[in-house]
Structure formats: structure tokens, C-alpha cells
Amino acid sequence: MSITAERKKAIVAEYANKVGDTGSPEVQVAVLSERIANLTNHFKFHKKDNHSRRGLLKMVSQRRRLLDYLKGIDQNRYQTLIKKLGLRR
């Protein structure tokens, strides 16, 4: 269900604005998107896992808040990120 340390490092390296950047909205959204994708796959086999579903909903809302923040700060970075991640908005 969770992502490995190597995968997380790869995501951070891909979306970071500078070396060691783990706190930028782009990196946080990318990591959350990976975790959301893993949990979505988990629910295909464990439909009644409501405890994890609550965590998924929290992650989705956190990602939404980060995306709204990024959109307010810099529209171009927001558009680039959602295209790169393949999000619907």
C-alpha cells in the first residue's frame, strides 16, 4: 500500500525545484498522487476496507488543498503539474 523509499526519492528528484526540495507543493502533490494511486489499486481487491478509505479521502482532500494553493501562487506551475501528473482539472 505504501510507496518504497526508492520510489519516493525518484518522485522527489523528478518534481523538485532544487536539490533536496521535499516541501514544495509540486513534490507533495506528486507523492500524494502516487499514494492515492496505490490505495485505489488496493481497493479493487479489498472493497470493504473502510478504515483505509478514510485515509484515502484525507489524502485526496490534502492534494486538493495543495493544488488550490499552487494555483493561487503560480498558475503556470499549476498547469504544468496537472498535465505532468495527468490529473483531470
Curated annotation (Swiss-Prot):
One of its GO terms (biological process) is translation. One of the primary rRNA binding proteins, it binds directly to 16S rRNA where it helps nucleate assembly of the platform of the 30S subunit by binding and bridging several RNA helices of the 16S rRNA. Forms an intersubunit bridge (bridge B4) with the 23S rRNA of the 50S subunit in the ribosome. Keywords: Ribonucleoprotein, Ribosomal protein, RNA-binding, rRNA-binding. It holds the Pfam family Ribosomal_S15. It comes from Bartonella henselae (strain ATCC 49882 / DSM 28221 / CCUG 30454 / Houston 1) (Rochalimaea henselae). It comes from the Bacteria. Belongs to the universal ribosomal protein uS15 family. One of its GO terms (cellular component) is cytosolic small ribosomal subunit. The gene is rpsO. This is Small ribosomal subunit protein uS15. Part of the 30S ribosomal subunit. Forms a bridge to the 50S subunit in the 70S ribosome, contacting the 23S rRNA. One of its GO terms (molecular function) is structural constituent of ribosome.
